[in-house]
Amino acid sequence: MEENSKFDKKSLKTVTGKTANFGELAKDCVAFANANGGVISIGIEDDSSLPESTQVISETLPEKIVKRINELTFNVAIRPEVITAENGGQYICLHVFPSKVSIASTTKGQYLIRDHDASRVLLPDELSRLISDRPSYNWETKVSLNIHWTKADEQKLHN
């Protein structure tokens, strides 16, 4: 399957060994969450459609991925699933859910979006538009510190 706005492929090296780069995976998860969600197949190389036939995913790897993505992102929801391909090789199908109410970001403050087959940083005007398009939290209905307005300082109410 070709990479597009809903699908991406990552090498298993992205999440294992000395070459693991969870930061890049986190950026892709943020980009998918800010778009309409998507799927990242981890363990399938860019030039392949199947994993290596001998590839086996360890039982702890999906949990490790969830833990690291949760540490590196805000407002990103993911669900990993280990899939056995036709050739017997295994890979992880990482479902990234769309962030419908809030804006997803990395813990470094990067806001990204999926654009065709790539993830890119949002420009300020795009971020403003994305924020205004999302239904926001209704702060007016939030009770702050459980203090009723009748206990407010009357002098401050009249100024």
Which functions belong to the PLM regions below?
Residues 1-159:
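Conserved N-terminal catalytic/coupling substructures associated with nucleotide/phosphate chemistry
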